[in-house]
Regions:
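Active-site helix of classical SDR
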Residues: 95, 99-102
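Hydrophobic positions on the long internal alpha-helix
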Residues: 52-60, 106-107, 165
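Conserved Rossmann-fold NAD(P)-dependent oxidoreductase catalytic core, especially the SDR/UDP-sugar
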Residues: 54-95
Length: 189
């Protein structure tokens, strides 16, 4: 990243005062989140996904923010409907989904109170061939392991596509916050 002109900073953002030492930024791509391995430490999920987000939102309230979110804050919908749209009411189920909505609400707060331009970037699974759902299924096929097919559909987009779209979203950020579902146009089973 340094060779590309990206200035990196290593910090434990949960430590008091650390956020104040970070430089101002015109644009913030907010990708902080705790998802996997949170069973038994749900307090940590809430701390990182909501409390820390509130601190970061306050610190960078003068920036344009693209905040990664998740489509799992939507209810399950029949496959034939094409899935949730940005107008679909949220119905988070479970600790992670609730904290994901909490993260959005922290950015909604600064967008509404301070005029911060925010885009809530909702996606489910960004995949590529080295990891993710495609890799998991391919590995099971290769190893002859059983594949759980109880969930017949999943919302997946290519990781490279997600990166390109996310960087273009700074120009779409608004106050109040804008929502963008990032998903493919077709349903494949």
């Amino acid at each position: 990243l340094d060779k590309l002109g990206v200035e990196t900073h290593k910090a434990d953002l949960m430590k008091p005062g650390v956020l104040d030492k970070l430089p101002d930024a015109e644009n913030v791509l907010y990708m902080i989140g705790f998802k996997f391995g949170s069973t038994g430490a749900e307090w940590n999920t809430w701390g990182i996904n909501v409390f820390l987000t509130g601190l970061c939102a306050q610190r960078y309230k003068k920036s344009r923010i693209v905040s990664f979110s998740s489509g799992n804050i939507y209810p399950f919908l029949p496959i034939g409907t094409g899935g949730a749209t940005e107008e679909t009411p949220t119905e988070p189920v479970g600790e992670y989904a609730m904290t994901t909505l909490g993260r959005e609400r922290m950015f909604d707060y600064v967008a509404n109170h301070f005029g911060t331009k925010v885009l809530q970037f909702r996606l489910n699974y960004a995949a590529e061939l080295r990891y993710g759902i495609i890799y998991d299924v391919a590995t099971k096929v290769w190893n002859g392991a059983p594949i759980d097919v109880s969930m017949g559909h999943v919302n997946v987009v290519w990781q490279g596509y997600v990166c390109n779209v996310a960087l273009q979203c700074f120009g779409l950020a608004e106050s109040p916050a804008r929502i963008l579902n990032v998903a493919g146009p077709e349903t494949v089973s």
